[in-house]
Amino acid sequence: MLTQSIRRQFLEYFKKHQHQIVSSSSVLPHDDPTLLFNNAGMNQFKDVFLGKSYRDYNRAATSQKCIRVGGKHNDLENVGHTSRHLTFFEMLGNFSFGDYFKTQAIRFAWEVSTQVFGFEPERIWPTVFREDDETFELWTQYVPAERITRFGEKDNFWAMGDTGPCGPCSELLYDRGSDYGNATKPSEDSSGERFLEFWNLVFMQFNRQTSGVQNPLPKPSIDTGAGLERVINLKMGVNSVFETDILRSIIAQIELLSGIAYHPQDQQSAAFRVIADHLRCLSFAIADGVQPSNVDRGYVLRKVLRRAVRYGRTLKLEKPFLAEVLPQLVSTMGSDYPELVKGQDRIAEILTIEEEAFIRTLKRGGNILNQVIEKSRASHQIISGDDAFKLKDTYGLPIEEILLIAKDSGLKVDEPRYQQLEEEAKQRSRHVHKTVHQIAGENIFADFVKVRGETKFAGFTQNSLKSSVVGLFVNGEFVEEMQSGQEGLVFLSETPFYAEMGGQVGDTGTLENSNSKFSVEDCVVPYKGLIAHKGKLNTGSLKNGEMITASIDKKRRQKIANNHTATHLLHWALHQILGEHIKQAGSVVDPQRLRFDFSHHKALSLEESRQIEDLVNQKIRENLPVKCYEIKYEEAQKKEDIKQFFGEKYGSTVRVIDIDYSKELCGGTHTSALGNIGLFRILKESGIAAGIRRIEAVTGAEAELLQRQDEDLLRTLAQQLKVPIHQVLEKLEKLQEENKQFIAELKEIKKKELNVLINGFIKKIEQLGNTSVLILETALSVEELRLCVDLISDQIPSAVIILGAAFPDKCQILVKISDDLVKQGINANEIIKILMPIVEGSGGGKQHTAQGGGKKPAMLGEAFKQIRIYLKEKMNVK
């Protein structure tokens, strides 16, 4: 394929010119919480440009996977409707870290453009920053001055932020000819279609101060980026990036799947382009460990997937289809990006699960939306913000889907009102947790640190030490003395107590001297660098400046350390059993148990749980030492085998927990050898959010106790069932089968008894127009009501059946509508929604069946009276 060839030739060219060829980084940014996804080739070198880290080379070239779907660079809504916008693309780039500058960068760009890309020299138009005479002069060595265009800061000046590295840039544009517009130079081409940008050279030569002053950098650098898809677009001479080899092959697969031919100018053509692009975006993101969810980048990914599904429906693709197109993507890009091949099955599974869930949402909310549309047409041609919010909040229908369907129906949505309700809901859901930070606000602790200094933590090597009291905090203020019986915070100059952080709970213990004893119930960080001992003074009084002995509860600390190290083992084991996509999403470590949240798209099977448990226990038995050491953060960044976590802020020096095969940056306390953990048992595995699973586990004595309880339960069952232990399961299965038979026989007996009643019920059917209607209050149980409704509908195939039963403090109602009457507009769910307010209850269902329960059984008769009136109006019966 041409794309593969150009990518390879680009990298080979720069390799010949002493550039280090660096593999594309993940689309998931490393240690950069400012980015949702990597969106440029320079992202992985950001710290190098900022001088925060260093590489063994000063020249580099890459082909970087990029995703642009949020923030400043958000191309999502344009994708499918223009010839060049993509959410996923590859960026070719060459970089200089204080080595070469403008002269060589321009020469490299010219040679690659004309020799590697094979572009006609006379069609290349450089642009420069209006004040950058140096770059203008350099370009005159390659093109006539009249083909060099000057632009202002908006187009030709680049900055990393309000402050920091910045500099002019020079773009390379390619003149596609008069077929793409009448403009004769770039300044006349407002659409950007004729003079298409394909490469941008950034000259980082200044450091912008907060005052706005730009000082020259001691070592200017180069950052360039060329969109591979645009290069291929120009190389092939086609109208759009979607007609290039890789994307067009995906579109061809969509044609086969949908049975609809792709014609670029047709109204339906946008759907082909959206699906082709979004499949690449989704597949690469999932391969790199991102999963669709309701938060952060997972939310953005879910939004992309649902947009693809919505456009798929315009091509009559009503069932999950993305996984069926995936093999085409893997076949064209898998050789260059093996993560696609390795993760293909998992990508397909996640895509299908997400599509199925969204299709269910569309079906559930779609019927209600149709009713809202009819109501809106009858009023002011506007779907109210309240209705839109209810569709989203109650039925899960995305606002994007509501807007799209409304537009297709010739309606508008009251978006300001919708946004108001959305914001109000967010405000209601924000819970305020009272912590030490809110006792008096952070300012008081910030001032305290400035005066008294940070707390020195010595707990990695000492369980007990002598220290001086530097602060006492009682009832929201600092005091000079704490009295017996008072609760508060004690601050020390040095402490062995670990403060709650990184999921690990704080230590407990005592602070004491000859005059007093303070029980430490928790240890927290109220402000960066400050450790607070939270608890109660049991005896005596405690004053600022006094010396005390600070002692942690050693047994408790050891249990916590064992559980924390076991958490690292669990994390490693999950990678081995489930795959490299596993990412930590949270953890809690306390003396009793550990809890670990991680990204995964489905529940663990019994076999997977057993494999994970067995692997962790195998490693515990091997009893390897657990090494803990500190290194410079920039050194840790260079080591690919050390795990660190996105969004976590690390200092210049970091602590590594090294178990040979598992290395993580971690500031917590750990056991000295794996054998100390003893035993590992999984208590529970569950889902806590879309795409996030949770494992709860115990170790040591707690695990032994759990094992003993399981054994005791098994022995008790064997005794009760009067069989040996190895036959318990067989006996239970036999009893279950017998129970099923008994229940079936009881149902048959009940049916025979009810048939007598049913004959009487059928005689009470009334005719409303041509429709058979049975509305009846009975003295049946809920189970009997269900049986009766089914038996009556078997005998009367076309009817509205509404049966109710009153009990002393509640009532129950069941509704069933035959298929022919549903088609005439009679809806069981609508009926139950009318009945429930009258009996002060709640309920719901579908078009054919619904049920509900109420708190006012005495109102059952009135409810049935009202529903008769409703049905008469619905059927136009007087």
Swiss-Prot record:
One of its GO terms (molecular function) is aminoacyl-tRNA deacylase activity. Signal peptide: none annotated. Zn(2+) binds at H564, H568, C666, H670. Its main location: cytoplasm. Its cofactor is Zn(2+). Transmembrane segments: none annotated. Disulfide bonds: none annotated. GO terms for cellular component: cytosol. Binds 1 zinc ion per subunit. Catalyzes the attachment of alanine to tRNA(Ala) in a two-step reaction: alanine is first activated by ATP to form Ala-AMP and then transferred to the acceptor end of tRNA(Ala). Also edits incorrectly charged Ser-tRNA(Ala) and Gly-tRNA(Ala) via its editing domain. Belongs to the class-II aminoacyl-tRNA synthetase family. This is Alanine--tRNA ligase. It comes from Protochlamydia amoebophila (strain UWE25). The lineage of its organism: Bacteria, Pseudomonadati, Chlamydiota, Chlamydiia, Parachlamydiales.
